[in-house]
Design a protein with these regions (language model features):
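Short hydrophobic, aromatic-rich alpha-helical segments embedded in or entering the lipid bilayer
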Residues: 1-7, 181-221
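Juxtamembrane loop-helix boundary motifs flanking transmembrane segments in multi-pass membrane proteins
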Residues: 1-9, 45, 95-99, 126-130, ...
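Transmembrane helix segments
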Residues: 32-40, 156-197
């Protein structure tokens, strides 16, 4: 990876206040507003009775990280709009380095979002022990984000900057609803069947590992693996299509 280009991308990311606010502050505000008003309530999640702030912290950690990774597409669309990607293509920068840096920056924002939600959760009395559960939960969340990194790169090379707002907002809302990130989905029925086939469901399950839920079974790994491969292929196709047009 080109260290200079990676450093430049990180600096541009930090200076992009709109992306930072949407990716980091929005999930944090949801947690504070909803968990704060229900901090004395409990909720049953697949047989686990959790305090509401605990449930909402692990759910919002996945949701916020998902927003952060898909929002990477908005940065790509903005770069395309001003011709930045065209300029990069006449430099020695390889396609592999370009994609690797986009993945790195997406994960960097996602980690910031997760860390903010953890701090807010602890401030609201969330207690998870032993400490290894925090590590296991975070590691599984990062694995579960792989499809969404691909989605962000895909839509960033496919859509215009004007289309990205509705696409990111609507897409993350739909994934959050079907994946049980806003509220627990039923253990049976059509919604449960649909949820198990999309990566946001397993991202939610990854967060729940921290509070005693079992880790993914084979189905979870298959869903994440298939979606990751499909989104990586689509991201590559969208990049080549965009390159050919320019």
């Amino acid at each position: 990876m080109n260290a200079v280009y990676a450093k430049y991308e990180m600096l541009r990311l930090v200076r992009n206040k709109r992306t930072f606010i949407f990716s980091l502050i929005f999930p944090l505000m949801l947690f504070v507003l909803i968990a704060g008003t229900n901090k004395d309530q409990t909720i049953d999640v697949g047989g686990l009775v959790l305090k509401f702030p605990t449930y909402y912290m692990v759910s919002m950690a996945g949701y916020g990280a998902m927003i952060a990774t898909i929002s990477g597409g908005a940065r790509i669309a903005a770069e395309r709009a001003v011709g930045w990607n065209r300029q990069l293509r006449i430099t020695p920068l390889s396609v592999r380095t370009y994609f690797a840096t986009k993945v790195l920056t997406s994960y960097a924002v996602a980690l910031c979002s997760i860390a903010l939600l953890y701090v807010a959760g602890i401030a609201y009395g969330v207690h998870i022990s032993p400490f290894s559960r925090w590590i296991e939960m975070t590691a599984l969340l990062l694995v579960g984000l792989a499809p969404f990194v691909g989605i962000g790169i895909f839509v960033g090379h496919l859509l215009t900057i004007d289309s990205m707002g509705p696409a990111v907002g609507g897409g993350t809302a739909l994934f959050g609803f079907l994946g049980g990130q806003w509220f627990p989905i039923p253990e049976h029925g059509a919604l449960h069947v649909i949820g198990q086939g999309i990566p946001s469901y397993w991202l939610t399950r990854a967060g729940q590992v921290g509070v005693g839920a079992p880790a993914w079974g084979l189905k979870g790994w298959i869903v994440i693996g298939v979606w990751s491969a499909a989104m990586a292929a689509l991201a590559g196709w969208a990049y080549r299509r965009d390159t050919a047009k320019q």
